[in-house]
Amino acid sequence: MAADDHIEMEGVVEEALPGTLFRVVLENGHEVLAHLCGKMRKFRIRVLPGDKVTVHISPYDLTKGRIARRTTTPSGGPRPARSGNRR
């Protein structure tokens, strides 16, 4: 697969699943299961529910994707509150 052979969409992380998987709701309302790209894992960029992300989706399987970037909020304010225990 070529480097530019993907569909790039914006979405919001709805749920964090085990094994660095995330359920992301795209702008058009579709849900995809997405994992973190290698650079985000390498630099330990945290993605939490409520974060706005850019997802690369393969044209061959539109239900799975790769989180390529976490975008910041335009206001620069605090991030959404986390639920659950913190490690």
From Swiss-Prot:
Domain S1-like residue range list: 1-72
Family annotation (Pfam families): eIF-1a
CDD domains: S1_IF1 (cd04451)
Assigned GO CC terms: cytosol
InterPro entries: NA-bd_OB-fold, RNA-binding_domain_S1_IF1, TIF_IF1
Function of the protein: One of the essential components for the initiation of protein synthesis. Stabilizes the binding of IF-2 and IF-3 on the 30S subunit to which N-formylmethionyl-tRNA(fMet) subsequently binds. Helps modulate mRNA selection, yielding the 30S pre-initiation complex (PIC). Upon addition of the 50S ribosomal subunit IF-1, IF-2 and IF-3 are released leaving the mature 70S translation initiation complex.
Name this polypeptide is given: Translation initiation factor IF-1 2
Organism per entry: Nitratidesulfovibrio vulgaris (strain ATCC 29579 / DSM 644 / CCUG 34227 / NCIMB 8303 / VKM B-1760 / Hildenborough)
Gene from which this protein is expressed: infA2
